[in-house]
Amino acid sequence: MALSDLNPVERNEEGIAAVLGILKQRLGERFQTGEAIRSQHAHTTTYIPTQAPDGVAFPETTAEVQEIVRACAAHRVPVVAFGVGSSLEGHTNAPGGGISVDTSRMNRILAVNPQDLDCTVEPGVTREDLNRHLRDTGLFFPIDPGANASLGGMAATRASGTNAVRYGTMRENVLSLTAVMADGETVTTGKRAKKSSAGYDLTRLLIGSEGTLGIITSLTLRLQGIPQAISGGVCPFPGVEAACNAVIATIQMGIPVARIELVNALQMRAMKNYSKLDYPESPCLFVEFHGSDAGVAEQAETFGMIAEENGGGPFLWTSVAEERTKLWKARHDAYWSSLTLRPGAKGLSTDVCVPISRFAECVMETEADIAEMGLIAPIVGHAGDGNFHVLVLMDVNDPKEIAQSEKFVARLNMRAIAMDGTCTGEHGIGQGKIGFLRHELGHGVDIMRTIKQALDPLNIMNPGKILPGN
């Protein structure tokens, strides 16, 4: 990541002026151009500079999204989809200006099919909204990124979360979707069948496309039954390597762990102070098991023995819902707790993912880099699938700190790629990781560019993201 890697996008002043007039007339108060609301719809969660759109539209239907996109296509004006703005790599920035399409009013749950374990929702529904709605059905949607993100945004970035080791990512949990493409036409990528061999997999093409190919306007999602019993707890370890070895042993023994999260010592200190946890300031694993009463108790006991064999413990676990909720709220608040380690600093949040056999090595080398460079950068990770996050705290007004932080992130990304991993497990490419995509995928980037040019020949759909250059 480097600010110098950000793709410049030329502004089309004449086209923008025309579209502003068209959308104001069509949407009335649901089209806003005030400075405050435009700034809110640019990227603000990390150090990438804010690049505001020229207007913000609040459509309520797929047909209105089509109208917006057609107007923008006619005048060659950029269109940037916006959910709740929780993405971390500059996805919602508008480097060439244009229109931000805020999907928050498209927040209906269109259908729930309990017997089929699926539901269909609009993109503005958040994961917490959906799970509140599902509570009385005995079902839940398991994907849980740290933020209460919109489901449309989660699909667009191919998000995952703490449950991915058991339930997968958005890639595995979206059955089909409807999207408005760059010409204003809609495409529905599939039916509700649990599997299909019918042609190209357009669902997977659009999942993770970050709004660069189309704007998602509905999704059909897989659901899971709420487990009969849940147990979970925290286990301290003398070091990161011991914790990672316990993770590998747990996975290899076939224990159906639902969550297994690594928190390094610095992150644990931040979480203790911010979330009032009473655990040691040492590397810890946050673990959870789903199943029957007998099953989760047996799994917890077995994990405790594995932890002890690797120098960890004691594993303190509970089946009390309130205690587990406090634990996982602290985990989901890790970003905010990290910021307290250096008040006033901005966070450069990054993530990588490596094969689980290289996870300990990657984390330990990263910690060595942090120490060598004198950075304040806590680590937290989805240890069960080899994915971890680093939040580098820095003074964004100090060019030397920015350069040092960017150097660190570059070394981390290249290390992950060299280990046969990826420069991003779940944040996406956006603006921040464009410079690493070719290192990871080589000629695959050229094929992506061909797809982009075929589906969006005017380059109006979230330009300046994913692909190097324009």
Where are these regions (language model features)?
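N-terminal flexible segment immediately upstream of the FAD-binding catalytic core
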Residues: 1-70, 86-117, 265-275, 321-349, ...
